[in-house]
């Protein structure tokens, strides 16, 4: 930053805000026009509300504990484990240490006047908040066991929209008198001063009205002899408190039938005996199976003789030539032409009486016949790598200067510039590579051509020699292996 330039934001006078969700205690949380997120000052987030101090007087502390159902008479502070129902959430802002070093202010400096904010009130939270949040208000209440069962049954009944009679107050007072009746449970049987007779009941009253009238009398009734468990109640508190009216019973029956379809015997694959039906011969599935079977058994041929024999058998039975009650048994007849073996012959096939192990010897040949038919083999000298007895004029076929001179004399004369034919192979390459001083253009051209031809000839000769040596080496190796094998066999014998 250039020195002397005023910064866009003065960090000493700036106010930091955090964008947070609107509190559930805010009345505007359900307003669609109000924003769901508000600005919260960073300094305000660090302010944590202080919990009220517990009372120090023992008498006041015991009264406070009795409000929550704690009746212990010791000095332990049980109030430290209790929390408020509102469950206030406090945001604690942790400042970045790197930014804290940059924004350090000297202790001697005094804070300036509070900055003025020109922001609308809709971006901030409401000043007044409700004691209970919207989520706690909207949460459904569970079963209230402290309610009267008659009230629960009345709220759950399906006769809410029926018109009340004119004397409903008198009827209610008459039904209330039954609350003062006494019941004696000493012998396990319920007794009452009032006796009910089936003749006293009105025939026009239905079962629901009768149950409503008898509800106060059945308040303390035991349900030992009734089955209140189902697939979805599981002896719950609601099934024992709320009376099952006609609609709820119908709903329970439907659920029972629905759950019955998911029993263990109905799960998994269907049983094969339950599958019924038939397909005609031209059905696609039958034809597909036939085509697959036909592809697999292509080698099976149709035997007309076999079918003819079976038809003749059944025809004789139908025409009466054979007894139809007689059971036909098919069996295979051995071919008399087939060679039969006895036990001794079969065992002889597994024996080795005709097996005589022996080393096969090479047949001997006379020297005259071998010399006339087969020439002497070529032997390779291991020192020079050349065949022996091929250098004429040398002593014992060795490579000497005299033998090389004789070989050079016997070689045909070569044609070339300046008596090139009288030189050896090495001298020929040297002469063709060196350019003489008095060489003309034509001589140079001829020398280049000869050098090129010479190199091609040497390349072909070198390749031919390499192949010849490889073949000869293979042949010699094969001969040595055969000789070694024959020698070992001879030593064993």
UniProtKB/Swiss-Prot annotation:
Record function comment: Necessary for the biogenesis of 40S ribosome subunits by regulating pre-rRNA processing. Non-ribosomal factor required for efficient nuclear export of the ribosomal 40S subunit. Necessary for endoreplication driven by Myc.
Signal peptide (residue range): none
GO molecular function: ribosome binding
GO BP field: ribosomal small subunit biogenesis; ribosomal small subunit export from nucleus; rRNA processing
Record keywords, A-Z: Coiled coil, Cytoplasm, Phosphoprotein, Ribosome biogenesis
Basic and acidic residues: bias regions: 465-474
UniProt feature coiled coil, ranges: 437-468
Species this chain originates from: Drosophila melanogaster
Oligomer and partners: Interacts with RpS3; the interaction is RNA-independent. Associates with free 40S ribosome subunits.
GO cellular component: cytosol; nucleus; preribosome, small subunit precursor
Deleted gene: phenotype: Lethal at the second larval stage because of defects in pre-rRNA processing. RNAi-mediated knockdown in fat body cells results in accumulation of RpS2 and the pre-40S ribosome in the nucleus and overall decreased cell and nucleus size. RNAi-mediated knockdown in wing imaginal disk results in caspase-dependent cell-death.
PTM sites of type Phosphoserine: 345, 369-370, 424, 427
Compositionally biased region (Polar residues): 479-493
Matches recorded under InterPro entries: Ltv1
Subcellular location: Cytoplasm
Chief location category: cytoplasm
Protein name: Protein LTV1 homolog
């Amino acid at each position: 930053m250039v020195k002397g330039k005023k910064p866009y934001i003065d960090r000493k006078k700036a106010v930091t805000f955090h964008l947070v969700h609107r509190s559930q205690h805010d009345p505007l949380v359900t307003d669609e026009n109000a924003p769901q997120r508000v600005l919260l000052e960073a300094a305000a987030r660090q302010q944590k509300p202080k919990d009220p101090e517990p009372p120090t007087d023992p008498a006041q502390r015991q009264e406070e504990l009795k409000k929550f159902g704690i009746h212990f008479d010791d000095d332990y502070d049980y109030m430290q484990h209790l929390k408020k129902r509102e469950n206030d959430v406090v945001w604690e802002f942790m400042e970045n240490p790197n930014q804290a070093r940059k924004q350090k202010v000297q202790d001697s400096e005094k804070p300036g006047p509070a900055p003025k904010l020109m922001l609308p009130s809709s971006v901030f939270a409401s000043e007044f908040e409700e004691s209970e949040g919207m989520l706690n208000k909207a949460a459904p209440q569970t079963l209230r066991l402290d309610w009267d069962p008659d009230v629960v049954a009345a709220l759950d009944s399906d006769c809410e929209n029926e018109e009340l009679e004119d004397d409903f107050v008198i009827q209610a007072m008459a039904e209330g008198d039954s609350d003062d009746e006494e019941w004696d449970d000493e012998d396990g049987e319920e007794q009452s001063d009032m006796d009910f007779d089936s003749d006293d009941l009105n025939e026009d009253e239905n079962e629901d009205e009768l149950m409503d009238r008898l509800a106060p009398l059945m308040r303390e009734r035991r349900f030992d002899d009734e089955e209140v468990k189902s697939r979805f109640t599981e002896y719950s508190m609601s099934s024992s408190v709320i009376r099952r009216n006609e609609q709820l019973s119908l709903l329970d029956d439907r659920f029972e039938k629905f759950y019955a379809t998911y029993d263990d015997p109905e799960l998994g694959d269907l049983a094969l005996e339950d599958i019924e039906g038939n397909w005609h011969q031209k059905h696609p599935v039958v034809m597909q199976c036939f085509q697959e079977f036909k592809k697999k058994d292509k080698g099976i041929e149709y035997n007309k003789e076999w079918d003819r024999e079976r038809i003749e058998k059944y025809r004789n039975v139908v025409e009466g030539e054979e007894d139809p009650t007689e059971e036909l048994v098919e069996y295979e007849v051995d071919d008399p032409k087939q060679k039969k073996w006895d036990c001794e012959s079969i065992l002889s096939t597994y024996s080795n009486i005709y097996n005589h192990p022996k080393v096969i010897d090479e047949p001997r040949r006379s020297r005259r016949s071998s010399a006339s038919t087969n020439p002497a083999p070529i032997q390779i000298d291991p020192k020079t790598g050349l065949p022996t007895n091929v250098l004429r004029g040398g002593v014992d076929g060795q490579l000497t200067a005299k033998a090389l001179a004789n070989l050079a004399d016997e070689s045909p004369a070569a044609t070339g510039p300046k008596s090139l034919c009288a030189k050896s192979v090495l001298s020929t390459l040297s002469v063709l590579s060196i350019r003489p001083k008095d060489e003309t253009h034509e001589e140079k051209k001829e020398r280049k051509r000869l050098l090129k031809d010479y190199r091609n000839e040497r390349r072909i000769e070198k390749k031919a020699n390499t192949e010849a040596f490889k073949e000869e080496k293979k042949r010699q190796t094969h001969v040595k292996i055969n000789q070694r094998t024959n020698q070992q066999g001879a030593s064993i014998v």
